[in-house]
Curated annotation (Swiss-Prot):
Gene expressing this chain: SLITRK4
Lineage of the species this protein comes from: Eukaryota, Metazoa, Chordata, Craniata, Vertebrata
Topological domain spans for side Cytoplasmic: 640-837
The name this protein goes by in its record: SLIT and NTRK-like protein 4
PANTHER family, per database record: SLIT AND NTRK-LIKE PROTEIN 4 (PTHR45773:SF3), SLIT AND NTRK-LIKE PROTEIN 4-RELATED (PTHR45773)
Keyword Membrane: yes
Residue intervals of the LRRNT domain: 333-375
Leader sequence residues: 1-18
Origin superkingdom: Eukaryota
Keywords, sorted A to Z: Cell membrane, Glycoprotein, Leucine-rich repeat, Membrane, Repeat, Signal, Transmembrane, Transmembrane helix
UniProt KW Translocase keyword: no
GO cellular component, one term: glutamatergic synapse
SMART domains tied to this protein: LRR_SD22, LRR_TYP, LRRCT
A Gene Ontology BP annotation from the UniProt entry: long-term synaptic potentiation
PROSITE patterns assigned: LRR
Annotated organism of origin: Homo sapiens
Length: 837
């Protein structure tokens, strides 16, 4: 087993070392397609984690696509080989860090896509080496901070997309050296945009996206309001909606006045101070060291009451334009928008980028969508908020297939029929806030496959049916705040990749984590404030879930309302044991990993969350291999044990432990012989010494202490079998003067022997015998080898007989031989020879 593990680890190490030196042609790993002499290299989902090991393609210009790979960190010189790349896609890589110099070598790069990653900061050295960059996309990340000078080297940058991040402010002069024409900062946490240091450097912008930020409509927002009012009509600027203070919540910034923004009068008149020469936008240094300016000093001025600043400059009042900026703005202002039909009570304007129509029917006392006559063609945005619309029919949006934004907020809508929006397949933003909707069900949102932003706040929603949001696979923002929700169905968010969720000011006493909150895998912001949280055991799971989230995801802290002793206390300040005393009786599991398993209690019982994610495939394969090897090893050991245990002699002999006797089978057979009855062989001679030989030859290797044993006879008689060695010792002590006699020897050994004892072939008695009978019992040895010599029978007795039986075919012949009278001298010689042995 250990050998297998060693071999596997060695193979992995060797393969790793080999990979570090291998350089592969990129078109052998990725797909390369040439379109109009431009090569497109697609390395999506090919498990690339070291692009510097790939050889660049043989092409003057090419586009690189490294989406959906394992590029968690970009190290210096990662793309050093790709000097002719004009675009680079790095989206969906879970990219967390970009080290300085990672893009060195990409001198020809024009477009960089970093969307859908986990970046938290853009450093000053992040974009070194890509000074020719014109397009930068970094949306749907976790960016909180942008360091000063992050874009200082990007003099040609025109498009910057930073929407749906966690940016709360923009540093001073962040866009000073860029040439931005498109800026998207939607879906962040920006509350204000100062003119000095930010807005003054984006005078050439033609599109600015400001939506979905918590704008603080106070005195700090006066510079932005003044700047927006002075922008020309053909420049698209997204709506900035006030979130604070509460009396201006939901109001458009452009609809507010200075008195509402700044009631105390402080800063009500927006002034632009004179900037020092170092901060002048267009200037250069002469050889004498003096600064020459191509634009006038910014004077501290106040726009006159009778003059419309927008007619003068196109930029905020007090800022004189350079010739370049002025010519650009004039070209936009002199462009005549196309003539398109516009509904009578509404105001329409054309979007400069795609010539789409923006229809503004806000607060026109419209009671039905059928009043919009004539219906606008090619409408991209439709604002009908602030009216008295009560019902919405299926036919109301039949001619609005190209809508990108639909605003139905602040009406009196109570019920929305099914399939109302089924033909709005291009809709990305839907506002239904400020109505009287009580229930949501799946049929309402059928057809909204591209919807990204859904606003349902300030309604009377009490119930949301299961699967309501499943038809919106691109939904990223959902506002359900200020409703009457008490619970959410299980898996309500499983079909929507929500990044921002607002559940503030509802009736939630607790929210289940399992099946509801744990489905929010792409969450970047959640607001749970203002709910009557019941700080008991049911809320422990929510508390643990909130604590695991990264900093800044939860907008505001959760406060308890019940029980009374915890009222107005922040949930995070209470320990789990205080919320749920039952946890004191349960031993807490030690934390052995950064993401331990968490046990909590819900109304359905204790639930245990999984410890951080799925097991890597390599570890899983290695574990299965180890288990397989251990199983084979254990099975082999069991097999060997069973075979060795079963390897035993086939026959055992009772009382005899020597394996030499393995071929001998003893059979005891009882004989009922009377003492006064003579056997049929009573006339035969008997030599008692053969009993000793038999005892020696059939002890089968017993120990010395076991060589002498007794056979008990039923009447109580005993036959003693002595060892030959003991017999020889006894013979040595016999008096030499004693006459050698067979009869005397027999009398000495068997004092009460029978006279009808005879012997024949004494020397052959050493050979094997068929059977041995002892005192009424018969010991048989089965005949297995036919080639053995004839066996002899030995019988001795006094009240018991020792019988050695032969086969029936030999019995009569042996009996005939034994009936002849024995030669005394022959017997004497054999006895003498035996004693010497």
């Amino acid at each position: 087993m250990f050998l297998w593990l060693f071999l596997i680890l060695s193979a992995l190490i060797s393969s790793t070392n080999a990979d570090s030196d291998i350089s592969v042609e990129i078109c052998n790993v990725c797909s390369c397609v040439s379109v109009e002499n431009v090569l497109y290299v697609n390395c999506e989902k090919v498990s690339v984690y070291r692009p510097n090991q790939l050889k660049p393609p043989w092409s003057n210009f090419y586009h690189l696509n490294f989406q959906n790979n394992f590029l968690n960190i970009l190290y210096p010189n990662t793309f050093l080989n790709f000097s002719h790349a004009v675009s680079l896609h790095l989206g969906n890589n879970k990219l967390q860090n970009i080290e300085g110099g990672a893009f060195l070598g990409l001198s020809a790069l024009k477009q960089l896509h970093l969307n859908n990653n986990e970046l938290k900061i853009l450093r000053a050295d992040t974009f070194l080496g890509i000074e020719n960059l014109e397009y930068l996309q970094a949306d749907y990340n976790l960016i909180k901070y942008i360091e000063r000078g992050a874009f200082n080297k990007l003099h040609k940058l025109k498009v910057l997309i930073l929407n749906d991040n966690l940016i709360s402010f923009l540093p001073d002069n962040i866009f000073r050296f860029a040439s931005l024409t498109h800026l998207d900062i939607r879906g962040n946490r920006i509350q204000k945009l100062p003119y000095i240091g930010v807005l003054e450097h984006i005078g050439r912008v033609v599109e600015l996206q400001l939506e979905d930020n918590p704008w603080n409509c106070s005195c700090d927002l006066l510079p932005l309001k003044a700047w927006l009012e002075n922008m020309p009509y053909n420049i698209y600027i997204g709506e900035a909606i006030c979130e604070t203070p509460s009396d201006l919540y939901g109001r458009l910034l452009k609809e507010t006045n200075k008195q509402e923004l700044c009631p105390m009068g402080t800063g009500s008149d927006f002034d632009v101070r004179i900037l020092p020469p170092s901060q002048l936008e267009n200037g250069y240094t002469t050889p004498n060291g003096h600064t020459t300016q191509t634009s006038l000093h910014r004077l501290v001025t106040k726009p006159p009451k009778t003059t419309n600043p927008s007619k003068i400059s196109g930029i905020v009042a007090g800022k004189a334009l350079s010739n370049r900026n002025l010519s650009q703005i004039v070209s936009y202002q002199t462009r005549v928008p196309p003539l398109t039909p516009c509904p009578a009570p509404c105001f329409c304007k054309t979007h400069p980028s795609d010539l789409g129509l923006s229809v503004n029917c806000q607060e026109k006392n419209i009671q039905s969508m059928s009043e919009l006559i004539p219906k606008p063609l090619n409408a991209k945005k439709l604002h009908v908020n602030g009216n008295s619309i009560k019902d919405v029919d299926v036919s109301d949006f039949t001619d609005f297939e190209g809508l990108d934004l639909l605003h139905l907020g602040s009406n009196q809508i109570t019920v929305i029929k099914g399939d109302v929006f089924h033909n709005l397949t291009n809709l990305r933003r839907l506002y239904l806030n400020g109505n009287q909707i009580e229930r949501l069900y799946p049929e309402i949102f059928s057809g909204l496959h591209n919807l990204q932003y859904l606003y349902l706040e300030y309604n009377l929603i009490k119930e949301i049916s299961a699967g309501t949001f499943d038809s919106m696979p691109n939904l990223q923002l959902l506002y359900l705040n200020n409703n009457l929700l008490k619970s959410l169905p299980v898996y309500i968010f499983s079909g929507a990749p929500l990044a921002r969720l607002n559940l503030r000011n509802n009736k939630f006493m607790y929210l289940p984590v399992s099946g509801v909150l744990d489905q929010l895998q792409s969450l970047t912001q959640i607001d749970l404030e203002g709910n009557p949280w019941d700080c008991t055991c049911d809320l422990v799971a929510l508390k643990l879930w909130v604590e695991k989230l990264s900093d800044g995801i939860v907008v505001k802290e959760l406060k308890c309302e019940t029980p009374v002793q915890f009222a107005n206390i922040e949930l995070k300040s209470l320990k789990n044991e205080i919320l749920c005393p039952k946890l004191l009786n349960k031993p807490s599991a030690p934390f052995t990993s950064p993401a331990p398993a968490i046990t909590f209690t819900t109304p359905l019982g204790p639930i245990r969350s999984p410890p951080g994610g799925p097991v890597p495939l390599s570890i899983l394969i290695l574990s299965i291999l180890v288990v397989l090897i251990l199983t084979v090893f254990v099975a082999f050991c069991l097999l060997v044990f069973v075979l060795r245990r079963n390897k035993k002699p086939t026959v055992k002999h009772e009382g005899l432990g020597n394996p030499d006797c393995g071929s001998m089978q003893l059979q005891l057979r009882k004989h009922d012989h009377k003492t006064n009855k003579k056997d049929g062989l009573s006339t035969e001679a008997f030599i008692p010494q053969t009993i000793e030989q038999m005892s020696k030859s059939h002890t089968c290797g017993l120990k010395e202490s076991e060589t002498g044993f007794m056979f008990s006879d039923p009447p109580g008689q005993k036959v003693v079998m002595r060892n030959v060695a003991d017999k020889e010792k006894d013979l040595l002590h016999v008096d030499t003067r004693k006459r050698l006699s067979t009869i005397d020897e027999l009398d000495e050994l068997f004092p009460s022997r029978d006279s009808n004892v005879f012997i024949q072939n004494f020397l052959e008695s050493k050979k094997e015998y068929n059977s041995i009978g002892v005192s009424g019992f018969e010991i048989r040895y089965p005949e297995k080898q036919p080639d053995k010599k004839s066996k002899k029978s030995l019988i001795g007795g006094n009240h018991s007989k020792i019988v050695v039986e032969q086969r029936k075919s030999e019995y009569f012949e042996l009996k005939a031989k034994l009936q002849s009278s024995p030669d005394y001298l022959q017997v004497l010689e054999e006895q003498t020879a035996l004693n010497k042995i």
